[in-house]
């Protein structure tokens, strides 16, 4: 039985670092294990222009722990006033690696997102021309659509028309939560990929609602039925190159989670690799872990894989704090509900 595994240092292709005191508190949890991350731009105000992305990158670099080797991959927040020329320049400079589509109101800090997709057609056409990926939060915001159906409806109503109207547009369907989303990615050809989170491989909607409300399992897209969770695990561990890790690790202070109207997001940066090693071992797929966390993502983003290696070693249960302290308040770690036996060694 495998007791250790050495792989290329992983990347996180969907990460929330926040800003200010929260950024300073959570950044070390990512840099401890990950070499690069696609950093989400949904700050207040959002990161819309190349200049704003450069300034945010500087703040991230200034907050790095001493000796950390980490490259933030910057993303622009797509709005109806985004300038195609600015997107082109930001991509040409090497600063920006993607543009993020948030349907207005779909998730945390998405009020500036897109309502009229005709108004972003010029940006999308520019992105298709230069090969810059569009990262998509794949949920409709129509209040008539049940929250558990919003991903499947988005594919039909929004994403498919966008892709038909913009040939060559490279798209990442982020944090896929349904079999519908998985099948859409699989059928999308070489310009289509999907990220899978750690927590959606572990929890279904019962974990959030059955026996009491558990706010630290509440995220968007919300976890779905068990049949979808099992399909996600199969996709993550099955060796398909179109799927890769995007944790969507989303820190909120506990006071914002444990309230009458709590924020959406699971904070998984600290223990993601140990959880994933457990999942891949359960599925008899430890040999495919490296592809999921370190190879498939760079291949889609047309970046070289990391040369540095890390080792995961199986041992006694990992002892982690229930929460980390930040200047913005304590942040509770995602609890997978089972002992973590895989330790990460640099």
Curated annotation (Swiss-Prot):
GO terms for molecular function: dihydroorotase activity; zinc ion binding. SUPFAM superfamilies: Metallo-dependent hydrolases. The modification N6-carboxylysine is found at residue 100. InterPro entries: Amidohydro-rel, DHOdimr, Dihydroorotase_CS, Metal_Hydrolase. Its cofactor is Zn(2+). The active site is at 248. Zn(2+) 2 binds at residues 100, 137, 175. Zn(2+) 1 binds at residues 14, 16, 100, 248. One of its GO terms (cellular component) is cytosol. Substrate binds at residues 16-18, 42, 137, 220, 252, 264. It catalyses: (S)-dihydroorotate + H2O = N-carbamoyl-L-aspartate + H(+). GO terms for biological process: 'de novo' pyrimidine nucleobase biosynthetic process; 'de novo' UMP biosynthetic process. Catalyzes the reversible cyclization of carbamoyl aspartate to dihydroorotate. Belongs to the metallo-dependent hydrolases superfamily. DHOase family. Class II DHOase subfamily. This is Dihydroorotase. It comes from Cereibacter sphaeroides (strain ATCC 17025 / ATH 2.4.3) (Rhodobacter sphaeroides). The lineage of its organism: Bacteria, Pseudomonadati, Pseudomonadota, Alphaproteobacteria, Rhodobacterales.
């Amino acid at each position: 039985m495998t007791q250790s595994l050495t792989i290329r240092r992983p990347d996180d292709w969907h990460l929330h670092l926040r800003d200010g005191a929260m950024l300073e508190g959570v950044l070390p949890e990512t840099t401890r294990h990950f070499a690069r991350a696609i950093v989400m731009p949904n700050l207040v105000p959002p990161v819309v222009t190349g200049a704003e992305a450069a300034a945010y990158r500087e703040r991230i670099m200034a907050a790095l722990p001493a000796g950390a080797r980490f490259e933030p991959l910057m993303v622009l927040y797509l709005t109806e006033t985004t300038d195609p020329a600015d997107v082109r320049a930001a991509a040409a400079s090497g600063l920006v690696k993607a543009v993020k589509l948030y349907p207005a109101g779909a998730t945390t800090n998405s009020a500036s997102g897109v309502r009229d997709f005709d108004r972003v057609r010029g940006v999308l056409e520019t992105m298709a021309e230069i090969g810059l990926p569009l990262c998509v939060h794949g949920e409709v915001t129509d209040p008539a659509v049940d929250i558990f159906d919003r991903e499947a409806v988005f594919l039909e109503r929004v994403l498919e028309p966008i892709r038909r109207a913009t040939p060559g547009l490279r798209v990442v369907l982020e944090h896929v939560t349904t079999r519908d989303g998985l099948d859409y990615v699989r059928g999308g050809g070489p310009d289509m990929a999907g990220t899978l989170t750690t927590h959606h491989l572990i929890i279904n909607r019962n974990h959030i609602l059955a026996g009491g409300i558990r706010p630290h399992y509440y995220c968007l897209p919300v976890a779905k039925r068990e049949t979808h969770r099992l399909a996600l695990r199969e996709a993550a561990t099955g060796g398909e190159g179109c799927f890769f890790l995007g944790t969507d690790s989303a820190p909120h202070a506990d006071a914002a989670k444990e309230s009458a109207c709590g924020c959406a997001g699971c904070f998984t940066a600290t223990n993601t690799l140990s959880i994933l090693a457990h999942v891949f071992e359960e599925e008899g797929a430890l040999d495919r872990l490296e592809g999921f966390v370190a190879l498939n993502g760079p291949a889609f983003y047309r970046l070289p894989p990391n040369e540095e290696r890390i080792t995961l070693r199986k041992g006694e249960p990992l002892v982690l704090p229930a929460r980390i302290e930040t200047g913005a308040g304590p942040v509770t770690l995602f609890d997978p509900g089972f002992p973590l036996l895989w330790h990460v060694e640099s």
